[in-house]
Amino acid sequence: MTVKTTVSSKDIDEAYLQLKDIVKETPLQKDHYLSQKYDCKVYLKREDLQWVRSFKLRGAYNAIIALDEADRQNGITCASAGNHAQGVAYTASKLNLNAVIFMPVTTPLQKINQVKFFGGDNTEVVLTGDTFDDCLKEALVYTEENKMNFIDPFNNIYTIAGQGTLAKEILEQSKDNDIQFDYLFAAIGGGGLISGVGTYFKTHSPETSIIGVEPAGAASMYTSVVLENQLVTLPDIDKFVDGASVARVGQITFDISKDIVDDYIQVHEGAVCSTILDMYSKQAIIAEPAGALSIAALDQYQAEIKGKTVVCVVSGGNNDINRMKEIEERSLLFEEMKHYFILNFPQRPGALREFVNEVLGPKDDITKFEYLKKSSQNTGTVIIGIQLNNHKDLGHLKANVDEFDKSNIYINENKMLYSLLI
C-alpha cells in the first residue's frame, strides 16, 4: 500500500466539507491601521477568534476524524506547545475519545489550563521536556507502548489539509469583495500551516506570493530549505515564540514548502513583542507570539508591499497575561529603549540624585536599582536599569555612565549576565 505524502487542493476542499460545521469561519478584516502604516491594503485572517483561539483545531479535527472508528476508540495522543493540544482536546471531548496530551514543561500556564478546559474528563495532560522536540520523543514512545494513535501537529497530510481550509475561506471571502492578494504572510513552526495554505493558494491564486515567517531563533524551515537543501535539526532554539519554536520541521512539510513558499523571513523575538504590544494598544487585538509573526514580518517587506494588497494570518491569540511583563521587557530591549549596567556606586546620601542629574536625560527614567553587594568601603556594586525617552540617546548615555564609572559593565551585550541578573 502506497502511503500518501503530499496534499492537493482537492484534499483541502474535502477537509473543508468535513470541518464546515465544526470550526468557525473566522473574519477576513481590512486593517486600516496597518494599511496606513505600510501604505498598502492589509487584511487579517483572524484565526485568533477560532473556537480554541488558533487555527490548529482545523488540522487536529481533520486528522482525528480520518482515523478508522476502531482506531479512534483506542485513544489518541499528541505532542504540542499548546495550540495543537487544544485542538486535539476539543476534538476528543466532541467525539468522546480518550486523549493523552504531552506538552513541554515550558508551556505557558494559560495554554495548559485551556487544554484541560477543552478536553475535560476525556483528556490527560503530561508535562515533559524543555522543548517541543523533547516532548515529541516521549509522546511517541508512550503511543507505541499503549497502542494509541498519534496525531501529528504538522507532519500529517490530514493535519495539513485541515490547516489549508483557512485558505479556502480567505479566497471565498475575498471573492465576495473582489479582492486579489499580491502577498500572503503566514507563520512557520513545523510547517503545517504554510504547507496547507500555500498549496491551496498556488492552485487557486497562483499570482499571490507566499511568504513564510519564522522566529529568528528557531528558523528550522529556512535553514533546511534555503541553507542546507535538506531536512536538518537545529542544535539549539529560542523557545520564546512557543507556538513556532521547532528544531526540526516535518519531512512532508519540508517537501511541500520547497515547492510553494516564495520567500522566508526571520523575525527577531523582540520585534514580535513590539508587534504584540502595538496590535493590543492600537486595536485591542490579543495575538500570541506566533500569531504576531506574520504582522511583524511586514517591516522587512515594506518596500515590496507598498501599494499592494496583503493578507496576514493571525494564527493564534492564546497569550498568557502573565507573560506581558516579559513581552514588554523584550520589546524595550529590541527597540534599544532599556539598558542595564553594573556600576560601583557611592554609598553616601545624595549619590543617586547626582547620578540622575549627571547621567540621565531629562525624560529618562530609572526602572531598576539594586545593590548586588554592599561593603564597608565607600562604594557598593549596583545593578541599574535605565529606560530612555529616545533610543538615539544611547551613545550619550554610555558616555555619561563611563564618566561616572569607567569600570562599568553594560549588561545588554552580555547574554549570560542578563539571564542571571534581570
Swiss-Prot record:
Needed cofactors: pyridoxal 5'-phosphate
SUPFAM superfamilies per UniProt: ACT-like, Tryptophan synthase beta subunit-like PLP-dependent enzymes
| Keywords attached to this entry | Amino-acid biosynthesis, Branched-chain amino acid biosynthesis, Isoleucine biosynthesis, Lyase, Pyridoxal phosphate
List each coiled-coil range.
none
- Which residue range or ranges hold the ACT-like domain? 339-413
Any one GO MF term held by the record is: pyridoxal phosphate binding
- State the pathway, as annotated in the record: Amino-acid biosynthesis; L-isoleucine biosynthesis; 2-oxobutanoate from L-threonine: step 1/1
PROSITE patterns noted in UniProt: ACT_LIKE, DEHYDRATASE_SER_THR
In terms of domain of life, where is this protein from? Bacteria
For the ligand (pyridoxal 5'-phosphate), the binding residues are N83, G189, G190, G191, G192, L193, S315
Under the heading PANTHER family, the entry gives: THREONINE DEHYDRATASE, MITOCHONDRIAL, THREONINE DEHYDRATASE, MITOCHONDRIAL-RELATED
Family statement = Belongs to the serine/threonine dehydratase family.
- Summary of subunit composition and partner proteins: Homotetramer.
Name of the protein this chain belongs to: L-threonine dehydratase biosynthetic IlvA
Task: Tell me the organism.
Answer: Staphylococcus saprophyticus subsp. saprophyticus (strain ATCC 15305 / DSM 20229 / NCIMB 8711 / NCTC 7292 / S-41)
Specify the taxonomic lineage: Bacteria, Bacillati, Bacillota, Bacilli, Bacillales
